[in-house]
């Protein structure tokens, strides 16, 4: 059995380390498998509304019926983690060992398309652009009121998605959550030490190295981070300095719709399935931070896909990762090479 050197890599964005143990990818697997991820298959909009509570005209478990929407549709989450009228379960506490404070916010669901069989990968570019414009609109509306606006998507049952209709979510909160706070502090420290925006500095160096770059266009670069934890984890970065999503120009948003669709097609083609992932935008915080200098921030979109060996074998968080330190089996460079070489035509078209 050949031995390969394992090593650790540092993630400066969240001040954490990850072990890269490439020899573990070859270990025999007799563990759990998941079902291959697919989209909902229905034959008509009428059937969709009956079977799928997120479809146009569908009735959700709250008893509220959706509009008969024909494009991207946004509604308040029926089971929100935050509300604007949150009542704290007891008073705030500031003891060193017992801290509690009130949280307020809003949670929304963003249905990308009325057709339950489509995803961002299989929608056309014009339809993806509509989703991007909705994201921008929501940031503009909620940013002045809330400290953090998190737009994200859980795609696939393996990452906890409760409905396979193409949709994402938005949670806006009156405080800066833990991971965004880490990113805020790390990027600020990097700027104070080096006089450079961390992720712009990083992108410049990755562009020279090339080995983890997957795809570029005039305005965006898609790459596997040097410190990636998830098997096919990637990051999408603007090629210029952009603090927040709302700072993107019209041409950049159009360019985003094109590269976003292309990269999601590549993801689906890895194992010829509806590739599951967790996707989320990060940019400079909002609310009271809008009056502060956040020029050290760089907007970025992260993808955390769990699949590792096949369409049915994901990465599982195991004991060492939970109790000690994160670890990955596939090197970021191999993941980048795999994604770079994959076709940009969706696999489903070859099956027709």
Curated annotation (Swiss-Prot):
Pathway of action: Carbohydrate metabolism; galactose metabolism
Keyword vocabulary terms for this entry: Carbohydrate metabolism, Galactose metabolism, Metal-binding, Nucleotidyltransferase, Transferase, Zinc
InterPro entries tied to this protein: GalP_UDPtransf1, GalP_UDPtransf1_His-AS, GalP_Utransf_C, GalP_Utransf_N, HIT-like_sf
UniProt KW Oxidoreductase keyword: no
Pfam families cross-referenced by the UniProt entry: GalP_UDP_tr_C, GalP_UDP_transf
Catalytic residues as annotated in Swiss-Prot or TrEMBL: 167
Binding residues for UDP-alpha-D-glucose: 77-78, 154, 169, 315-318, 320-321
Cleavable signal peptide: none
Record-linked PROSITE patterns: GAL_P_UDP_TRANSF_I
BP terms from Gene Ontology: galactose catabolic process via UDP-galactose, Leloir pathway
Record-listed Zn(2+) binding positions: 165
Enzyme's top EC category: transferase
Entry-linked CDD domains: GalT (cd00608)
A cellular-component GO term for this protein: cytoplasm
E.C. numbers: 2.7.7.12
UniProt keyword annotation of Disulfide bond present: no
Family: Belongs to the galactose-1-phosphate uridylyltransferase type 1 family.
Description of how the protein assembles with itself and partners: Homodimer.
NCBIfam families: galT_1
Protein name: Probable galactose-1-phosphate uridylyltransferase
Source organism of this protein record: Caenorhabditis elegans
